[in-house]
Amino acid sequence: MALASDKFVLSAIVLAVLTVAAAAAGYGGYGDVGEYCRVGKAVSRNPVPSCRNYIARWCAVAGGRLDSGKQPPRQLLEPCCRELAAVPMQCRCDALSVLVRGVVTEEGDRVAGMISQHAAPGCDAATIAGMASALTDYGRCNLQHTGFFGCPMFGGGMD
C-alpha cells in the first residue's frame, strides 16, 4: 500500500517532467512554428526555385503520374536539395506549400504558386503537391526531418 507521501512525490515528478517537456516544445521545438515560418521570415517569397524546376521536369518525365517510377536526372535534384537544406527544418513543408499553392502575405501581396501558374503541364494539383512533399523524404534529399515522412499536408495557400 502506497503512502500518501509516495503518491505526492510521484505526482511532483510527473508534473516536473511534463513542465520540462512543455518548455522544450515551446523553445526551439516543433510546436507552433506558424509565425516563424511565414513568408518574409524563415520562408522567402520565392522559396526553393530549383525545386520548382525539378517538379516541372518530373511532371514531364513521369507523364503526370507520381507513381510512374520515372524521375529527372539526379543533377537536377541536387540544387533543389541544397535549397531545401537551407530552409529551417520545421519550415520546409511551409516553403514547399508556398512554392506549390502560393500565399497571400501579411501585406496582402499575392504570391502565385505552381498550380495557379500552370508551371507543370500534365500534372494535376494533387500530383504537384505529392511531388513537392516527396522532396522531404529522407531517401530523396537525405535531409533531417521533423519526424514526418514527407509533408503530411499542405495547409492554406491560394489555390
From Swiss-Prot:
Q: Which residues form a coiled coil?
A: none
Q: Which UniProt keywords apply?
A: Allergen, Disulfide bond, Secreted, Seed storage protein, Signal, Storage protein
Modified after translation how?
Five disulfide bonds are present.
Q: Quick check: keyword Signal in the entry?
A: yes
Provide the disulphide bond pattern.
C37-C91, C51-C80, C59-C123, C81-C141, C93-C151
Nucleotide-binding recorded as keyword = no
GO molecular-function term, one example from the UniProt record: IgE binding
Subcellular location field: Secreted
> Which Pfam family, just one, is annotated for this protein?
Tryp_alpha_amyl
Q: Which residues form the signal peptide?
A: 1-24
GO terms under cellular component: extracellular region
Family, according to the entry, reads as follows: Belongs to the cereal trypsin/alpha-amylase inhibitor family.
Per its database record, what is this protein's job? Seed storage protein.
- Identification of the protein by name: 17kDa alpha-amylase/trypsin inhibitor 2
